[in-house]
A protein has these predicted regions:
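Conserved Lys-Pro-Asp/Glu-containing loop-to-beta segment of HAD-superfamily phosphomonoesterases
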Residues: 154-170
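Substrate-recognition element of Asp-dependent hydrolases with the DxDx(T/V) motif
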Residues: 83-136, 142, 146-148
């Protein structure tokens, strides 16, 4: 018997690949990556993963995202635009267009909610996640958010999962 369900966010609920949120912005500005986008993204996400636990408050988290975007843009060969675009991207952090949803994510959560399942997020993310989930319209579906930077430990640490399960009464 299923008693509760947990979800990750990146590439489960929100599309995390730069091709969904960064490349359209660059195209709109007439900019084309000159470097290896995939390699730049892997390195930027590695930087984020290594530093996100420090981002327990919004100011620190937004600084982390600014540096993430700057590194990503530099890695893509867009050094001349990296500072300005990284500031712009961080300024848009509450814009739902910045966080495109995985197709079917909201419908799935809605259906699970309608069936009465307790739902939680368990994600390696920073302090921005609760507000991001609200602006994209997904926050209302969750009974609990276990966010690594807020909790102080990251997956695969079982404490993050345990926190969610205890909050759901499982």
């Amino acid at each position: 018997m299923v008693r509760a369900l947990t979800f990750d966010v990146g590439n489960t609920l929100i599309l995390a690949s730069p091709r969904f949120w960064l490349l359209p912005l660059l195209e709109a500005r007439g900019l084309r990556p000159r470097g290896d986008v995939r390699k730049a993204a892997l390195e930027a996400f590695r930087f984020y993963e290594e530093n996100h636990l420090k981002a327990r408050d919004l100011e620190t988290a937004l600084g982390l995202w600014r540096e993430f975007h700057r590194r990503l843009l530099v890695g893509m060969g867009l050094e001349d635009h990296a500072e300005a675009l990284s500031r712009e991207l961080v300024a848009r952090w509450k814009d739902p267009a910045t966080w495109p949803l995985v197709p079917g994510a909201e419908a799935t959560l809605k259906a699970l909610r309608a069936k009465g399942y307790p739902l939680a997020v368990v994600s390696n993310w920073d302090a921005t996640l609760p507000e991001i989930l609200e602006v994209v319209g997904l926050g209302r579906y969750f009974d609990h958010l276990s966010v690594s930077a807020v909790s102080g430990y990251a997956k695969p640490d079982p404490r993050l999962f345990r926190e969610a399960l205890e909050a759901l009464g499982v």
